[in-house]
């Protein structure tokens, strides 16, 4: 049995194999601005809530354009969607705790937050948390790194 990956030329003229990660950006974008708003609106219906019931929306920081589209489609004011992608980029599943640490560590307050992660494998989910922000740690920056 040969377990070596087979190289193939893809439609974008790049040679890839099963070990290479490749995302179909437009499909993920369409998913993000179509399925995620539906998920959020379905959540409102299921929980008998609306956008006004949450202090902030902690959303996966895919890109700013997607965040703005979600804001528009779900009628969420942008000032209720903290943004960290401009400073930290797309951190995948880490983007939600990163937003929490970036925006809420300095001042203790009780908040009701809507959280939603979406992306890899076209997966998505959402929920709410009630939190006192004094339990959120600040971001720790360091020059340390791990050697292979």
Predicted stretch roles:
Residues 25, 32-35, 92, 100, ...:
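Solvent-exposed, flexible loop/coil residues
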Residues 35-38, 92-95, 106-109:
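A short linear-motif detector with a strong N-terminal bias
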Residues 1-84, 135-148:
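Hydrophobic pocket-lining "lid/loop/helix" segments that shape and contact the acyl-thioester
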Residues 63-73, 94-100, 130:
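Short amphipathic alpha-helical segments at helix boundaries and their inter-helical linkers
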Residues 97-148:
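Conserved beta-strand-centric core segments of catalytic alpha/beta enzyme folds
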Residues 84-96:
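Active-site-adjacent helical/loop segments in soluble small-molecule enzymes
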Residues 63-65, 88-90, 120-122:
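Short Gly/Pro-enriched loop/turn and capping motifs at secondary-structure junctions
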């Amino acid at each position: 049995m040969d377990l070596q990956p087979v190289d193939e030329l893809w439609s974008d003229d790049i040679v890839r194999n099963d070990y290479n990660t490749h995302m179909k950006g437009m499909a993920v974008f369409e998913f993000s601005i179509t399925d995620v708003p539906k998920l959020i609106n379905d959540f409102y219906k299921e929980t008998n809530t609306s956008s006004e019931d949450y202090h902030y929306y902690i959303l996966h920081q895919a890109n700013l354009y997607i965040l703005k589209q979600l804001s528009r489609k779900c009628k969420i004011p942008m000032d209720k969607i903290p943004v960290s992608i401009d400073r930290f980029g797309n951190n995948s599943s880490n983007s939600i705790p990163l937003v929490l640490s970036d925006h809420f560590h300095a001042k203790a307050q009780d908040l009701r937050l809507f959280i939603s992660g979406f992306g890899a494998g076209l997966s998505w989910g959402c929920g709410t948390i009630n939190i006192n922000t004094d339990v959120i740690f600040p971001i720790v920056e360091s020059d340390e790194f791990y050697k292979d």
